[in-house]
Amino acid sequence: LDVLKELIAMSSYNSFLEIDGEIIGFIICMREGRAHKSPNYQYFKKRHKHFLYIDRVGVKQDFLNMGLGAYMYNKLIHSDDSKEVILCAEVNTKPENLPSINFHKKIGFKLVEKKQLNIYNEVAYFELIN
């Protein structure tokens, strides 16, 4: 929970979905120039002068496959925070997160590179020019 609070404080865009006071979904994003140590954030920092990195997205299990992820991404894509910047995200490919890979491709993200982080983990880097 402390890590999540830290990320929210560092974020330049975040959105939360609530039902009856309970958070059922969230998205946390960061612009360039943040002190974020994530190797994935650092990857995009080296590639772009201006970007918005999608760091965390979550939907509560009971609310999966209801379009909430698409709703949050659509809200982000049409926000002033994402105008004239490249939206950046990474998705695990080892272990494979096929639903997320397909989701990002469906909404227009393009695969730019895959990177082996260690013997257990590999990620795919995606970008959307907004």
Model-assigned labels for residue ranges:
Residues 1-20:
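Active-site rim helix/loop that mediates acceptor-substrate recognition in acyltransferases
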Residues 59, 65-78, 106:
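Conserved acetyl-CoA-binding loop-helix of GNAT-fold acetyltransferases
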Residues 22-25:
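Glycine-rich acetyl-CoA-binding "A-motif" of GNAT/NAT acetyltransferases
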Residues 116-130:
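C-terminal "cap" of GNAT-fold acetyltransferases
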Residues 28-56:
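Conserved acyl-donor/pantetheine-binding loop and adjacent beta-alpha core of acyl/acetyltransferases
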Residues 70, 94-113:
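Conserved active-site alpha-helix within GNAT-family acetyltransferase domains
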Residues 55-65, 92-94:
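A short, internal acetyl-CoA/4′-phosphopantetheine-binding micro-motif in the GNAT/acyltransferase core
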Residues 80-93:
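Conserved GNAT acetyl-CoA-binding A-motif
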